[in-house]
């Protein structure tokens, strides 16, 4: 059963502008250590950063809380499986919150084109929970 749906779109140019002004500030605010290593390996790609930003915003929207008190950018790591499919790894604090809400699964789709990055998230709960 669907708990929530979230989507976010972000201008890659906007992220690039912020990275040019204050790369460390933005990177430290939105990327986990694992993501920082990937970001560096990808030549500090604005598209990489924009996709992670959009994914985390979409997750927070699906959760219904937005980024803030319940979930921060650093509470979520976006990884890819061996086939390239993206998925989330929540922090322990967020994992416990999701368990409390009965949320058992998060589906993530991320895409980018020349100017924009977009992410779509569906959160699921068990039928018995709701």
Question: Regions from the language model: what does each represent?
Answer:
Residues 1-130:
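Core catalytic alpha/beta fold that binds nucleotide/phospho-ligands
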């Amino acid at each position: 059963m669907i708990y929530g749906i979230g989507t976010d779109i972000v201008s890659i140019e906007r992220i690039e502008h912020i990275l040019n002004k204050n790369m460390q500030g933005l990177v430290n605010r939105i990327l986990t250590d694992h993501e920082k290593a990937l970001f560096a390996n990808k030549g500090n790609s604005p598209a990489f950063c924009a996709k992670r930003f959009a994914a985390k915003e979409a997750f927070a929207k699906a959760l219904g809380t937005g980024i803030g008190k319940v979930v921060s950018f650093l509470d979520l790591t976006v990884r890819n499986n061996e086939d390239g499919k993206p998925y989330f790894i929540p922090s322990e604090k967020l994992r416990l919150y999701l368990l409390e809400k009965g949320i058992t699964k998060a589906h993530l789709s991320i895409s980018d084109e020349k100017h924009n990055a977009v992410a779509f998230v569906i959160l699921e709960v068990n039928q018995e929970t709701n």
